[in-house]
Design a protein with these regions (language model features):
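Active-site glycine-rich loop that binds ribose-phosphate moieties when present
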Residues: 120-139
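Internal active-site segments that recognize and position negatively charged phosphoryl groups
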Residues: 133-159
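Short, solvent-exposed secondary-structure boundary/capping segments
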Residues: 112-119
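Contiguous hydrophobic segments
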Residues: 74, 84, 125, 144-147
């Protein structure tokens, strides 16, 4: 039997397991994918195993929904912080969470929200074939915030079928390890919509 918790942050949902005892078999990627499957499992965007760390309050061992290892996830690390505080009954206002992309500092805001310092964006990454590519008639630029993202600016998000374009970009041969995809519409100089 597996005891798990379901958390969500800004539209992403996660299965979280207390794995400080290291009993969850991380080698079984099929099991991870099945847990995250929305039709045959619990359903989630990813699996977070909360583990002990000698460098931080805890380690976020993160897996994508298909069972592959990921460096981290910004929304996931905020959920991991909330889970850690509830699990340990801690009243800390700042946490350090170790990830494969380094240690992240999470601030517990008043009102129950969490902020994370993601660090400076990285514009060259082993998963980027070049600085930009035109795919599906959209120019995508690449940035890593601990994991790779393809960001494409469009005139109107309403004219784009993200459920069609997203998987084509994510699984494009240029990205053998896959890539996160965001489409951005500029509303004003200070306001952007993102899908």
């Amino acid at each position: 039997m597996i005891t798990f918790y379901k958390y969500h942050g800004a539209g992403n949902d996660f299965i979280i397991i207390d794995n400080r005892d290291k009993k969850f078999d991380v080698q079984n990627t099929k099991k991870i994918a099945l847990l995250c499957d929305r039709h045959f499992g619990v359903g989630a965007d990813g699996l977070i195993l909360l583990e002990s760390s000698d460098k931080a309050d805890c380690f976020m061992n993160y897996y994508n929904a298909d069972g592959t290892i990921a460096e981290m996830c910004g929304n996931g690390v905020r959920c991991a912080a909330k889970f850690f505080l509830e699990l340990t009954k801690s009243s800390k206002k700042e946490l350090l969470i170790d990830t494969r992309a380094g240690i992240k500092k999470i601030i517990c805001n008043s009102g129950g929200s969490f902020s994370v310092n993601m660090g400076a964006p990285i514009f060259s990454h082993k998963d980027f074939p070049k600085n930009s590519l035109v795919l599906e008639n959209i120019e995508f630029n690449f940035v890593s915030m601990g994991n790779p993202h393809a960001v494409g600016f469009v005139k109107s998000l309403n004219d784009i079928d993200i459920s069609n374009i997203g998987p084509k970009i994510e699984n494009n041969f240029h990205f053998p390890n896959k890539i996160n995809v965001e489409l951005v519409e500029k509303v004003s100089d200070t306001h952007f919509k993102v899908k």
